[in-house]
Amino acid sequence: MTNTSLEVIGYVRCDYKEKFGIPRQSGLTGCAAAFIEMLPPYNQAEAFRGLDEFSHIWLLWDFSRAHKNGFTATVKPPKLGGNQRMGVFATRSPFRPNNIGLSSVRLLDIIYNEENGCVHGLVVSGADILDGTPVYDIKPYLPYTDSHPEATGGWTDSLDIPELSVCSSDDITAKLETIFSSTQIEALKEILAQDPRPGYQDEPNRRYGMLYGGYDIRFTISDDTLTICEVAEPGPQ
């Protein structure tokens, strides 16, 4: 087997601080913004010439918290309740022969360094990537070849995509508004509305928690309603 190495060209900076709660696919949370911090020498302005003419880009990145030794041919997709196996190449599981992720995101802005003219980073939305994730490459999204309206989705075509109603008390709502921007709150609600729990967890009285923007967001789910019940600073790790 021939080994190869990949160059890290940048890092993702965003509000997703742990794996639980991250959107399961890119594009599901249009309000969630992320910043791709570029590293030299890949931050040269010339490398980005013409990119601002594209509305969307592809990001190739590293499942940096999913590395493990050995190859497993099948995995249990959470959306199938965690009790059915599919071939790893028929899923987007992070546990792959090469831990490479692929996401299509909307390009919102290119930020330049005023002192040296280099690119500080890219502002994108719709990312499904953890904060601190290494990025390997950036490519433009080409509608004429990357979009396939006739495509079928295999086993995912039969999935019931949840859409929960997200609510909170007046006190919790006020606390959210003092901590986060309106865009961050809208992105949080988009994430929660998709039901971040694994498919095999359905305990109405259980309190769940996810790290978002440096805070522990705790919630319960009953029927089709998700209630944010606490917003707290995370405890010591």
Predicted regions and their residues:
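Conserved positions in beta-strands of structured domains
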Residues: 13, 105-108
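Flexible glycine-rich active-site/ligand-binding loops centered on an Asp-His dyad
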Residues: 120-157
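Enriched for short, Lys/Arg-rich terminal
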Residues: 130, 222-237
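Short, conserved beta-turn/loop elements at beta-strand boundaries and strand-helix junctions
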Residues: 17, 109-119
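Short coil-to-beta-strand transition motifs
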Residues: 2-8, 95-105, 213
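Arg/Lys-rich, positively charged N-terminal/basic patches that mediate binding to nucleic acids
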Residues: 1-45, 51-53, 143-190, 206
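Active-site-adjacent substructure of cysteine-protease-like catalytic cores
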Residues: 49-101, 200-204
